[in-house]
Amino acid sequence: MKTLILTLLSLYELQLCCGAYNQNIRSQRKFEMIKTEISSYKDVAKSIIDLAVHGKAQNRSYERLALFVDTVGNRMSGSENLKTAIAYMYKSLQEDDLDRVYLEPVKVPHWERGEESAMLLEPRKKSLAILGLGGSIGTPVEGISAEVIVVSSFAELHNRSKEAKGKIVVYNEPFVNYGETVRYRGSGAVEAAKVGAVASLIRSVTPLSVYSPHTGWQWYENDVPKIPTASITVEDAEMLSRMASRGLKIVIQLKMGAVNHPDADSYNTVAEIVGSKYPEQVVIVSGHLDSWDVGQGAMDDGGGAFISWEALSLIKDLGLRPKRTLRLVLWTGEEQGGVGASQYYELHKKNISNIDLVMESDIGTFMPLGMQFTGKPEARAIMTEVMQLLQPINITSLYDYAEGTDINSWMQAGVPGASLFDDISKYFWFHHSQGDTMTVQDPVWMNLCAAVWTVVSYVVADMEEMLPR
């Protein structure tokens, strides 16, 4: 009996092994078929690349963007400029003869900075360049004049908490990388308020400064007093730190006319090329249309928005129609935490099984180096093959972890996601500053970015099967 049981167990294990082996063989065969399918797009990919980089569409995304930002300017959430920008894009997309163009209403924060200034009163008089941080409250009309404490970290602030009461906290945090250093912009006011400070000034989150403050959104916490907060230049933060190290008394007068208005009406702007075979299934290409209220918002995120529009234009110009719908979404309210995209997700998540791939470009359109991808290993293997279609421009690398505030909800829910990976070595020089203008952009780089964006989105949208998830 014991021998029989062992024999049956052995046969069962053998069956399992054979089943796994056969499954692996089937998977390998299927993947080889997918590779063959992807390889069949070489001519189409070359046509897209030729049109975008060398043909009639050369420099088009750059020229469209230049006209847009020169005409509209920056596009702060809730502002009249953003309304103008959305109307401009709605009209332009209609004129591009795409299949569907429509607006989806959302609510967005409406904050205005108003007049603002900072004056060093002691140990000498000097005007300090500032940019109020998004969501900040204002000061009284007469401003706030207070002694300053300079710290280089949250840990130092907490260790010196008794010194901070009634003072303005100046953070002179070193730039490590954006993800690490931006914590001071986001939470600096809250941490300062917890120890009794009356305002906070944050060293701009940038590795390079030419006396230019960089703004950005910050967040208050319930049950913590709200205090005014602004960014200052790297140069002034370092000067104040040197003064403090010499034991000098530092006094600053801060005036901010910032106002938080009720949420405003806005729209996500959407355009589509409807799929020929599976129109209910969708590949999304996207960038955000809003920007900060300084500079032109050409880099952040005009470039990403306009290469996403260019993807649909190139496909239309070549007379192509993918099997799935290719959907352009120009998000609103991204700079306030992706509020437009969050509302889009809530509205459309019931159709999540039909969202094949979400793509977002929001970290510049400099020289493209490849794509970042988040998804199952099987999907990654397919995307690796798709990237090989870009060999004519030598941009074939696929990196881990797609990035994008506006597509995070989809990726967290299991939808494959992709983002443009480009040379961002200079990105944070201009980020959220007056320097974010059309001068940052390069038409050759934008052509290449558009080619990458279009080839990937079209091929994924046209393949017979959706990406595994």
UniProtKB/Swiss-Prot annotation:
Main location: endoplasmic reticulum
Function: Carboxypeptidase that may play an important role in the hydrolysis of circulating peptides. Catalyzes more efficiently the hydrolysis of dipeptides with unsubstituted terminals into amino acids.
Family (UniProt): Belongs to the peptidase M28 family.
Active site residues of this protein: E334
Gene that specifies this protein: cpq
Binding site for Zn(2+) 1: H288, D300, D362
EC number(s) from the headed UniProt entry: 3.4.17.-
Subunit description: Homodimer. The monomeric form is inactive while the homodimer is active.
Gene Ontology cellular component list: cytoplasm; endoplasmic reticulum; extracellular space; Golgi apparatus; lysosome
Propeptide: 20-42
Keyword check for Glycoprotein: yes
Keywords associated with the record: Carboxypeptidase, Endoplasmic reticulum, Glycoprotein, Golgi apparatus, Hydrolase, Lysosome, Metal-binding, Metalloprotease, Protease, Secreted, Signal, Zinc, Zymogen
Protein name per Swiss-Prot or TrEMBL: Carboxypeptidase Q
Top-level taxonomic group: Eukaryota
Pfam families for this protein: Peptidase_M28 (PF04389)
Species in which this protein is naturally found: Xenopus laevis
Signal peptide: 1-19
GO terms of molecular function: carboxypeptidase activity; metal ion binding; metallodipeptidase activity; protein homodimerization activity
GO BP annotations, alphabetical order: peptide catabolic process; proteolysis
